[in-house]
Design a protein with these regions (language model features):
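Extracellular low-complexity, O-glycosylation-prone stalks/linkers
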Residues: 1-62, 69-109
Length: 109
C-alpha cells in the first residue's frame, strides 16, 4: 500500500462537555494547511470551520454543546495554481459529554 498521501486515523484524544481535542495522522503529501469543519450531526445549524497550519496534526474545537452528536471533518488542502485542491476528507462522529455540574463543587483537600 505504501504511505497514504491523505490524512487518516482521525480521532478524539481528549474531550470535555464543551470542547474536543482531535488528532490525525498526516499524509505524505506536502499540504498548505488543513481545513476542519464541525457541526451538529444531522443538524441544520451552519457548519463551523477553521484552518490549521500544515505542520500541525491536532486541533482544539471549543464552544460545543454538552451531550450533542457532532460530525467533524478534516480536509487536507493543497494550493495548486491558486486553486484550492482538497484531498479526500476524513470524518468522525462524536458525542460530547454531558456536563455534570456537581463535579465542579468537589474540592479535595
Amino acid at each position: 500500500m505504501g504511505v497514504s498521501d491523505v490524512p487518516r486515523d482521525l480521532e478524539v484524544v481528549a474531550a470535555t462537555p464543551t470542547s474536543l481535542l482531535i488528532s490525525w495522522v498526516a499524509g505524505a503529501e506536502d499540504y498548505q494547511y488543513y481545513r476542519i469543519t464541525y457541526g451538529e450531526t444531522g443538524g441544520n445549524s451552519p457548519v463551523q470551520e477553521f484552518t490549521v497550519p500544515h505542520d500541525l496534526v491536532t486541533a482544539t474545537i471549543s464552544g460545543l454543546k454538552p451531550g450533542v452528536d457532532y460530525t467533524i471533518t478534516v480536509y487536507a488542502v493543497t494550493d495548486m495554481m491558486h486553486v484550492e485542491y482538497t484531498e479526500h476528507p476524513i470524518s468522525i462522529n462524536y458525542r460530547t459529554e454531558i456536563d455534570k455540574p456537581s463535579q465542579h463543587h468537589h474540592h479535595h483537600h
